[in-house]
């Protein structure tokens, strides 16, 4: 039988990478129990020490695979009976010009940046609609909010993911389900640094100069920014997209 608890239940699709660990900490500090995709065992212990009940679901964080988000949702409902909030980030960063691009590159980007949020939304939306409440946040990219020289395919597909999210929000707003998107760029995390070469201090400085705030974003502050879209304190915003890129958009 599912556990019954007055605490809110949050689902984090990938709790191991990108902002997933910081989002998990944010939820724990705000009194949530958690269903997490592929969390590090040390993170689970930390969250439990903060008072959260943690359900760790293995081998589901790659949400480009259509079955993985559904596995996480099914596990969360089996354990807790429901969930109140769900968040996912995905992506496949392949820079380069349009002229030099290939259909193989486009297919990889679509798989990581459009199919992934599609599968996630298909899994999390129906149970939230059925229960008549819930909050969903899809993390896309600020590159989808403006033309991005050097990343034309990536920018275009990210724009599609953002608009998919906003369209879903319009469909389910009357069911008291909020669905929003936030797009990042210039964030300090390994995949960005590797894809752009910004592990090199000189290259990093070049990127920082493109950001009006003249630095890269931190994951802890980004998790705090995401909180009102997910923690139940603000439930009258849906269908919105916000960039989180230090003023670049």
Feature map (PLM): residue ranges:
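Active-site helix of classical SDR
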Residues: 121, 157, 165
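Alpha-helical segment proximal to the catalytic Tyr-Lys
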Residues: 126, 170-174, 235
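Canonical Rossmann dinucleotide-binding motif of NAD(H)/NADP(H)-dependent dehydrogenases/reductases
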Residues: 2-35
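Substrate-binding pocket helix/loop in short-chain dehydrogenase/reductase
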Residues: 97-98, 102-110, 203, 207
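A glycine/serine/threonine-rich, flexible loop-to-helix segment
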Residues: 174, 186-210
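Short C-terminal tail/terminal secondary-structure segment
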Residues: 4, 146, 209, 227, ...
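Residue(s) in the substrate-gating loop at a strand-loop-helix junction
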Residues: 141
